[in-house]
Amino acid sequence: MWHLLDLNMLEGVVRLLMFGLEKYGVRDSWKYLENGEDRWYSACIRHLNAHQSGEELDSESKQMHIDAAILNLIFLRYHYLKNKKK
């Protein structure tokens, strides 16, 4: 089933994961964010709004807003599923 996904589309997402690791020094620090579901949803919307407004790159990471939104959705999904198990 994984053959259906062109992994090259995720290159920007992986670059953002590397940026986060360099910035915070902890792998998977996004998993431990308080109120993760709400915060990752808000972050996703911010990046989508910036993209919709014509801003291609995030000023801090220098990566595409659309890639940041995709990564935020992945993080949001993780927190949603974690909270659903409670």
Enumerate the language-model features and the residues they cover.
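Intrinsically disordered, low-complexity regulatory regions
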Residues: 1-86
